[in-house]
Amino acid sequence: MSNYEKTQQLPIYQKAELLFQLVESLAASLPEDNELLQSIKEIMRADAMMLPAKIAGAEAGNIYSIRMQNAAIIRFHAMSIYTQVGGLRMYDDTIDKKFIQHIRTEIENFRLLFINWVQSFDTSNYIWDEWELFNPKGAIPPTDVDSFDFDDYMDESN
C-alpha cells in the first residue's frame, strides 16, 4: 500500500473529504445572482480543498515541525469554513439552516479527529524552527558547535 493510500485510510483524511463534498453541495445550492454569496462560495471551496491536500502533505513526511506547519494551515482553513458557513445563516430564504448546522457539526467532528492526529506526531523528529512556533516542547536550539563547516571535511593535502 502506498503512502497516499495509507493517508486516504486515515479518519481525519476521510472527514476532510466529506467536508469537501458537503461544501461542494452547499456551494451548488447557492443562488448565482448574489455576488456576495458567490464570493463566499469560492472562499469555502478553496478552504475545503486545502484540508485533504495539507493532510496528505503532512503525512508525506515525518518531520514534526513540517507536520505542525501543515496542521496550522489545516486549522486555519477549517475555522474559515466554520465561519463562512455560519455567516450564511443570515440568508433565511435561500439557505437550508439544517444543512448549515450539519456542516458545522462535521467540522466539530473534524476538530476532534484533528486533535488526536496532531497528538500522534513524533516530537523527537524535528528540524529547529527559527521562528520557534513549531518546535516541540523541550526542544533545544542548535548551537555553533552543531553547525556544519565544509573545511572540516576537506583533505588538507590538496
What would you call each of these model-derived segments?
Residues 1-158:
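Amphipathic alpha-helical assembly/interaction segments
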